[in-house]
Amino acid sequence: MKDYIKLNEDRWNHVNNDYTEPLTHEEVEEVRKNPISVALTVGKKVPIEWFEKANGKKILGLACGGGQQGSAFAIKGYDVTIMDFSASQLQRDEMVAEREGLKINTIQADMTKPFPFEDETFDIIFNPVSNVYIEDLENMYREAARVLKRVEC
């Protein structure tokens, strides 16, 4: 049953479309000048109110490789870690970070398995539409809850 995970990983390692195009230098400069603008899914930008002032907040880009959202978060001052199972997607993040002088941690890992982080590591998890590619959402969300810092409401 887990063969679909390997097939999906192989596909993302070889796909070349808008979801895998890293930010250009010109796009990075636009991000530097404007409020943060990222999408969780095609055509739907995240409301800017969802983002607090960065102040070094730790953000996990879960299945978020590709050199787009992670770069935008790093530009805006977040402490960024990207976790993705696609080596080629992570290479795009590393390429943009190196080219633009950004700090982005990349971790190659499978979101269907225990996350390689301590409890309460991150302030925010940004997970663009990727949960549709896995069978066991409960485990993924359990792991996400485990690595998120607790806050008082």
What is the predicted role of each segment?
Residues 54-114:
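Class I SAM-dependent methyltransferase SAM/SAH-binding core
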Residues 1-29:
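N-terminal, positively charged/glycine-rich alpha-helical extensions of SAM-dependent methyltransferases
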Residues 112-125:
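A short acidic, Gly/Pro-enriched loop at the edge of an enzyme's catalytic core
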Residues 57, 121, 151-152:
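Surface-exposed loop/turn positions
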Residues 24-57:
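Conserved alpha-helix/loop element of class I SAM-dependent methyltransferases that forms part
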Residues 138-153:
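A short glycine-rich, Lys/Arg-flanked "PGG" loop and its adjoining helix->strand segment in the class I
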Residues 123-138:
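A short SAM/SAH-binding and catalytic strip from SAM-dependent methyltransferases
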